[in-house]
Amino acid sequence: MATAKKSTAKKSAAKKPATTARAAKTDATVLLQRDHADVKKLFKQYEKLADAEADGEERQALASQICAMLTVHATIEEEIFYPAAREAEVDDDLLDEAEVEHASAKDLIAQIQSMSPDDELYDANVIVLGEYIDHHVQEEEGEMFPKCRRAKMDLAELATALAQRKAELMAEV
């Protein structure tokens, strides 16, 4: 009988969303860095498609995936991570800049979503968005995250909250 209980417990543990389970073993900055790496790969894929003058539907599908991923990522940072960083008195100027960068990215995302992949500047908008995001990521990972690690933030607890909210938002996409 004890064996049956163990296998049932393992099955229910396996049903946890992977991001939530992973978050329990990491900290918030690592979770956010994973998102950064994932979206960077998608931008590289997009550039290859654009260079190869790939089918518009294929480019649009990838651009939509990028936009959705970035929208969810920005939301969890704005709702959870940035307020926690402000509370821990991490550099307010750096956080202000990050929020302005998010606003610029959201504007480009809205432009991309309103365009057709056949529009003259479609590829340019997606590529420029990638460049904006690359700059934003460099500042977060190079300046903000180290300051957050030194501040009195519960990064493990934040990772769990970020992963849960991300799962909720991804379910809506």
Which role fits each region the language model picked out?
Residues 2-173:
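Small-residue-biased structural context
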